[in-house]
Amino acid sequence: MDHLKRQDEKVFAAIEAELGRQRSKIELIASENFVSEAVMEAQGSVLTNKYAEGYPGKRYYGGCEHVDVVEDIARDRVKEIFGAEHVNVQPHSGAQANMAVYFTILEQGDTVLGMNLSHGGHLTHGSPVNFSGVQYNFVEYGVDAESHCINYDDVLAKAKEHKPKLIVAGASAYPRVIDFKRFREIADEVGAYLMVDMAHIAGLVAAGLHPNPVPHAHFVTTTTHKTLRGPRGGMILCEEQFAKQIDKSIFPGIQGGPLMHVIAAKAVAFGEALQDDFKTYAQNIINNANRLAEGLQKEGLTLVSGGTDNHLILIDVRNLEITGKVAEHVLDEVGITVNKNTIPFETASPFVTSGVRIGTAAVTSRGFGLEDMDEIASLIAYTLKNHENEAALEEARKRVEALTSKFPMYTDL
């Protein structure tokens, strides 16, 4: 980054500091990952200069012959990965992908059935502070009070009672497999559309390690980062019958020109996801998550639903007599990055919470293995149990440093 260093020392310094943070800390935020250098090169390419309103072959600007190739590559690779009939790779985020689906099939005030945010849903699944909860009449379903797994009988009962036009499946903090076939059966029974937000599990689906929602849903949305290990962005997969409507909802509906440099980076990441070693990577994510969950339970920590089927683990910290906010802060102090998170049947404020959400996608990208999960579980428990003991926290910092030093990353940067 010689040019940046000469041009803008302040921004260069901030980026260098962030690189240092990523290298020196254990990244356990479930929605984060480390992209390849190839993905970063594509995102930092000259494609950032190109305006390309419209779609390949139907642009509102000239000079789009090369970016058309890139967007077609991205779309074709997604179709190959997930078996989708139609793909739109232009959404700038998962939230905008969800918005586009809503704008395609809903009118203001329509009833939608979505997962309660504190039970594992997402802001765009009907939270009253989000456009989705403001524009539409969302009815919430949640998890069982004992198992903390989705109660499909409750979903069916609420669907029959409220007759939603759309049912939203998918989550941002749900550690178990979701039965998309069952959701489609419920949707069909009440005459509703089904949209699946697979943002967190897309990489696992791509590797064939989680049920694929595409055969069951009218619409599937996802981010392109998280377990899919691409750049930050979104996309929509849908049945061919909705293709023109979805494309129109994205452009000119809610977006202008697509970010072609990001779409190029998406294409590269999708190419990586088609390789055999990506399947190995995704399996290692799950193996690491299971090992980490087992280690945390051995240390006496409570896990929502008792474990995990995917990359994500939700820790209930109430038995440690601390809050999620305190847990996030003290873990960050020793070099372990997590996020505080609400848990099912939460009583604390979302700014405080009773839980911590962690995931294994990023550490697996870095090369961490099963024995490293044992050490991370020990570190998390040791830190939380000794959160007011500075000597213990200093010991934890040294252990984190020893662990991260074994896995150098982005050495060419």
Curated annotation (Swiss-Prot):
NCBIfam families linked: PRK00011.1
PANTHER family recorded: SERINE HYDROXYMETHYLTRANSFERASE, SERINE HYDROXYMETHYLTRANSFERASE 1
Major enzyme class: transferase
Protein name per Swiss-Prot or TrEMBL: Serine hydroxymethyltransferase
Pathway(s) of this molecule: One-carbon metabolism; tetrahydrofolate interconversion; Amino-acid biosynthesis; glycine biosynthesis; glycine from L-serine: step 1/1
Cofactor dependency: pyridoxal 5'-phosphate
Modification sites for N6-(pyridoxal phosphate)lysine: K226
Catalytic reaction list: (6R)-5,10-methylene-5,6,7,8-tetrahydrofolate + glycine + H2O = (6S)-5,6,7,8-tetrahydrofolate + L-serine
Compartment(s) where it occurs, according to its Swiss-Prot or TrEMBL record: Cytoplasm
Function: Catalyzes the reversible interconversion of serine and glycine with tetrahydrofolate (THF) serving as the one-carbon carrier. This reaction serves as the major source of one-carbon groups required for the biosynthesis of purines, thymidylate, methionine, and other important biomolecules. Also exhibits THF-independent aldolase activity toward beta-hydroxyamino acids, producing glycine and aldehydes, via a retro-aldol mechanism.
Primary site of residence: cytoplasm
Organism, scientific name: Bacillus anthracis
Keywords of the record: Amino-acid biosynthesis, Cytoplasm, One-carbon metabolism, Pyridoxal phosphate, Transferase
GO terms of biological process kind: glycine biosynthetic process from serine; tetrahydrofolate interconversion
Residues the UniProt record annotates as site (Plays an important role in substrate specificity): H225
Subunit and partners: Homodimer.
Annotated residues for binding of (6S)-5,6,7,8-tetrahydrofolate: L117, G121, H122, L123, E239, S349, P350, F351
One Pfam match: SHMT
Family under the similarity heading: Belongs to the SHMT family.
MF terms (GO), sorted A to Z: glycine hydroxymethyltransferase activity; pyridoxal phosphate binding
EC number: 2.1.2.1
UniProt superkingdom: Bacteria
InterPro entries (UniProt xref): PyrdxlP-dep_Trfase, PyrdxlP-dep_Trfase_major, PyrdxlP-dep_Trfase_small, Ser_HO-MeTrfase, Ser_HO-MeTrfase-like, Ser_HO-MeTrfase_PLP_BS, SHMT-like_dom
GO CC terms, sorted: cytosol
